[in-house]
């Protein structure tokens, strides 16, 4: 690749006229541009891949909450999303909530080269209170014991991180978006279990009360 401008994420300033050599999908050399017998792709700007740290890989976008989709429809939307990420330069995504923990199956298929897509960290199902935000595809848990069990269940299935619903949200009907839902005590045991397993957590917190 002949990069007229290269932003490598390490240098203080962009570099110009760089030759990037790739082999088996990996960059093996970056040097000042020179003539070569190998095929060269011209690129105005080359940067490291972008990260998107909050996605829901199986959810079609732009349809609101009223339309329902079949599993097959969601599967093809998922494939389209994966292609769109790669084509827009996104090479890493953090998936924060997927029904039936399907995101981990998708992650494994990407890693195995079965389908093309970005690198993925997956949270599986979110943990929410009964009837709370995300209950349709999440694990409903009330009290510290149920929350601890929910976290352990997800960790057993192989999640990369655990997603917690601290407040309501706009995409769940009948729920006040800013209302506090899981208690601090409930969230604490989820975080404890995740950390014991060497995993991080991510929390949906919409509104000041949930953030606090």
Which positions does each model-derived feature cover?
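N-terminal metal-binding scaffold of metallo-dependent hydrolase/deaminase domains
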Residues: 1-35, 44-46
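N-terminal carbohydrate-binding accessory modules
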Residues: 45-49, 107-108, 112-121, 125-128, ...
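Hydrophobic faces of well-ordered beta-strands that scaffold small-molecule active sites
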Residues: 49-55, 93-94, 120-124, 162-164, ...
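Active-site environment of divalent metal-dependent phosphoester hydrolases
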Residues: 56-60, 95-103, 128-130, 168-172, ...
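Acidic/histidine-rich helix-loop elements
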Residues: 58-73, 130-145, 172-181
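Histidine/acidic residue-rich metal-binding segments in metalloenzymes
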Residues: 105, 146-212
């Amino acid at each position: 690749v002949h990069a007229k401008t290269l932003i490598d994420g390490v240098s203080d300033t962009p570099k110009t006229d760089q030759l990037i050599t790739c082999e088996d999908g990996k960059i093996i050399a970056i040097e000042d541009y020179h003539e070569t017998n190998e095929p060269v792709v011209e690129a105005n700007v080359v940067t490291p891949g972008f990260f998107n740290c909050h996605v829901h890989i199986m959810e079609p976008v732009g349809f609101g909450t009223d339309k329902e989709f079949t599993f097959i429809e969601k599967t093809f939307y998922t494939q389209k999303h994966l292609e769109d990420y790669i084509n827009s330069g996104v090479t890493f995504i953090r998936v924060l909530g997927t029904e039936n923990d399907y995101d981990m199956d998708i992650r494994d298929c990407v890693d195995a080269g079965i389908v093309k897509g970005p690198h993925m960290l997956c949270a599986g199902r979110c943990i929410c209170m009964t009837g709370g935000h995300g209950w349709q595809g999440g694990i409903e848990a009330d009290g510290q014991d149920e929350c601890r069990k929910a976290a352990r269940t997800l960790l057993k299935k192989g999640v990369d991180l655990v997603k917690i619903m601290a407040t309501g949200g706009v995409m769940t009907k009948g729920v006040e978006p800013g209302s506090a839902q899981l208690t601090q005590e409930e969230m604490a045991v989820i975080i404890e279990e995740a950390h014991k397993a060497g995993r991080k957590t991510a929390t949906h917190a919409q509104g000041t009360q949930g953030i606090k």
